[in-house]
Amino acid sequence: MFNTMFECFKKESMLFELIAFMERNSDGFTESRSNYNECLNMLRKELGNNAAVSVDEFDAALHDAICSDLVYSAYLGFKANLDYYENPLANNFLEVDPEIYLREGTAHRLPAYDKAYAKVNAFYEQLSPELKEATDAITDYESHLETVGPKLAHYWAFKKANSFFPKVIPGYCASIPFTYAYEHMLAKYMGITIIQLNEISIDATSEAS
């Protein structure tokens, strides 16, 4: 069943599916995630129970920020599909940099992202210079999720729109050639097959274990 565009996403389900997908298909991600968890464990030992922002609060906030990106990118994917249908010549986003069609500047000014990153920044501010230097694994892990996650969310929503818009827009017809070009471009970017790419499903029906 098709789910509501914006409000149906469950943070736990989204993260579970994204992380599981990347562990299967993204080179270096499994090691990056392992290093991230080791870094968090080190910080727990160093900070103890006296931290103003705990490691667990930091971990949750970091993933909240990622989820904010995913939701916004999914919205943009739905919108891009309709924009392309209405005016394909003016809305071929495959010809521009992903930073443009994912609107990263706007994504990182959204209230949910701001709230989450305020907590992230507060956590870093309490670290000593030595501990800050030991957080490269966090930066690497976050970079993996921020680089790939929004692209996958945008693509997933774009394809979902192909089957949803005919139900609500008279005369709508999905552009199969453009959809194929999109999935081919993204699969090539990730170094995977189109079949592997289409295993992604970040809606609320995905259940985390």
What residue spans do the PLM features occupy?
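Intrinsic-disorder/low-complexity detector
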Residues: 1-193, 204-209
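Extended oligomerization regions of viral-like shell subunits
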Residues: 194-200
